[in-house]
Amino acid sequence: MASEELQKDLEEVKVLLEKATRKRVRDALTAEKSKIETEIKNKMQQKSQKKAELLDNEKPAAVVAPITTGYTVKISNYGWDQSDKFVKIYITLSGVHQVPTENVQVHFTERSFDLLVKNLNGKSYSMIVNNLLKPISVEGSSKKVKTDTVLILCRKKVENTRWDYLTQVEKECKEKEKPSYDTETDPSEGLMNVLKKIYEDGDDDMKRTINKAWVESREKQAKGDTEF
């Protein structure tokens, strides 16, 4: 749901709260108000995160660490995409193409891979990715070393399947961020369902209260009075 539509829903709830007098109605509207405010906050955080990711992509991916012999740097910056047959992970490491071939090692399992780059500018670099979203073919997976880049090729066990995420953990985190109601429906449907349930379950006084608050809020909006 677009942020603008969420803001309109929030304003509508605030108008109804001003008019409602029944405790049950106010409690339901207050709960709906909190849900909408939380979703607006999540939308803003997602926008900020996307901006931060765009800025990170413009920076060198190699992690900078003090030059200490034997020190291992954990790789956290990478990019990935996919084809019908492979999931491809790109790791940028300055000068990696100049180290001996045997210094770049990748170990694959059906649901993970482990990259270790030894002795690159006095440090080692490690990247471990567990719980891949789907199984891969260990025998069909490989790595390539290009200029300043390590390319890891994970062969999909089932070809022509799409990976929406790289790992199962990432998928679960994204699904937890989804709102509890269907965001593909009409923007006001969540609020309307709450009011409809209260109306259907309420007595005559409650129905009159909701009807009065609804009519007055509509009249107020029609006149352009949007003070909240």
Swiss-Prot record:
Organism: Macaca fascicularis (Crab-eating macaque)
Primary site of residence: nucleus
Protein name per the record: Calcyclin-binding protein
Annotated Gene Ontology cellular component terms: cytoplasm; nucleus
InterPro entries listed in its UniProt record: CacyBP_N, Calcyclin-binding_UBL-bridge, CS_CacyBP, CS_dom, HSP20-like_chaperone, SGS_dom, Siah-Interact_N
Sequence positions bearing N6-acetyllysine: K8, K19, K85, K118
PROSITE patterns: CS, SGS
PTM annotation: Phosphorylated on serine residues. Phosphorylated upon induction by RA or at high calcium concentrations.
Domain (SGS) ranges: 168-228
Start and end residues of each stretch annotated as Interaction with SIAH1: 2-80
Subcellular localization(s) per the UniProt record: Nucleus; Cytoplasm
Keywords: Acetylation, Cytoplasm, Nucleus, Phosphoprotein, Ubl conjugation pathway
Domain CS: 73-167
Subunit structure: Component of some large E3 complex at least composed of UBE2D1, SIAH1, CACYBP/SIP, SKP1, APC and TBL1X. Interacts directly with SIAH1, SIAH2 and SKP1. Interacts with protein of the S100 family S100A1, S100A6, S100B, S100P and S100A12 in a calcium-dependent manner.
Residue positions where Phosphoserine is found in the record: S3, S34
Superkingdom assignment: Eukaryota
N-acetylalanine: residues bearing it: A2
GO molecular function: S100 protein binding; tubulin binding; ubiquitin protein ligase binding
Residue ranges, annotated region (Interaction with S100A6): 154-228
Role description: May be involved in calcium-dependent ubiquitination and subsequent proteasomal degradation of target proteins. Probably serves as a molecular bridge in ubiquitin E3 complexes. Participates in the ubiquitin-mediated degradation of beta-catenin (CTNNB1).
Residue ranges that the Swiss-Prot or TrEMBL entry lists as coiled coil: none
UniProt keyword Cytoplasm present: yes
Chain positions covered by the region annotation Interaction with SKP1: 73-228
A GO BP annotation: heart development
